[in-house]
């Protein structure tokens, strides 16, 4: 008898910033996005840090990481929006969670990864003074491949 709907198939097309496993895991979803530039936006897969200037006592306020900032979390894929605006609440994936990210080139399993500033990519080429964001769980063969990454913000900054 043929199955009408396969609940265990892995045929859902992954997107940058989407959870690879346990998409219904508890997540920190009440972070407020801040930027001094009111027209700035963030997208799934962007890495965020806690805002050092926040005086909010109700929930975390986050801003986009610079290349040397150690992340607090990564913006999770949301099928309802392409980008989040300043002042909106965003969900963040945290250390230990496995997400889909875009490779800058060939990456081997187990490689420590850094974000490439100003792009959507992660790479295993260590750049001095750049923060690590996690470890490759699957292999990438070329630039643009989606790979599974176990987020680990405790790896610190290179060099």
Can you name each region flagged by the protein language model?
Residues 1-159:
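Surface-exposed, low-hydrophobicity beta-strand/loop segments enriched in small/polar/acidic residues
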């Amino acid at each position: 008898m043929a199955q009408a709907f396969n609940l265990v198939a892995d045929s859902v097309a992954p997107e940058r910033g989407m959870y690879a496993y346990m998409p219904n895991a508890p997540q920190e979803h009440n972070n407020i996005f801040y930027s001094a530039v009111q027209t700035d936006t963030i997208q799934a897969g962007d890495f965020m840090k806690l805002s050092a200037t926040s005086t909010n006592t109700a929930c975390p306020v986050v801003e986009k990481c610079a290349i040397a900032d150690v992340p607090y979390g990564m913006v999770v894929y949301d099928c309802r929006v392409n980008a989040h605006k300043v002042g909106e609440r965003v969900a963040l994936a945290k250390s230990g969670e496995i997400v889909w990210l875009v490779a800058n080139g060939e990456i081997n399993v187990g490689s420590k990864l850094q974000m490439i500033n100003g792009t959507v990519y992660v790479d295993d080429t260590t750049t001095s003074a750049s923060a690590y964001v996690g470890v490759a769980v699957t292999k990438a063969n070329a630039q643009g491949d989606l790979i599974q990454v176990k987020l680990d913000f405790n790896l610190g900054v290179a060099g």
